[in-house]
């Protein structure tokens, strides 16, 4: 039953992504998976389906709505004794809203919030085992002693600034923070961006 539900969910995602949208709007699907780098532990997977839409009252504001799922596993993922885990099994299913506001042609900030759930309701165990079954042909993970099922709330903030080096070559930086019941963190991302730099990051 769980496999059928997950396959249906993936089919709907594919349909949404391939559906043509107005050029002023955008749908993105981002997938993180550490098996791309031949490993599968700690931050194991992330799936993010996002919908972007300019604010109808101010074209310099961008609204983003994201449905996402995060999956974390211990390094010894086939170990059945939770006392030997170096990290708990954990899944997080969430809905996130952010509003990004333009500050200049190369900078912006965003504020937002996130509501989600951990535990069985996150669907993480089923999603990970389905991927292992269909794509990798690996045995199912037991998911012993996973993080309990609880409602989670987070506040989000970020600041983006781009620096033009020369035509179509730019440095980017983004300072971001999360504060709430699921995550408390802050970080700085730096990058090299090839293309026309904008305030969107």
Specify the residue positions occupied by each region the protein language model found:
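Residue-level signal for the start and early helices of compact helical domains
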Residues: 8, 12, 58, 62-63, ...
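Outer-membrane pore/translocation modules
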Residues: 27, 67-201
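Short loop/turn segments at connectors of secondary-structure elements within structured domains
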Residues: 17, 23, 59-61, 105-109, ...
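Bacterial Sec-dependent N-terminal signal peptides
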Residues: 1-26
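Residues in flexible loops and secondary-structure boundaries
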Residues: 9, 13-14, 37-39, 57, ...
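N-terminal ordered "arm"
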Residues: 24-62
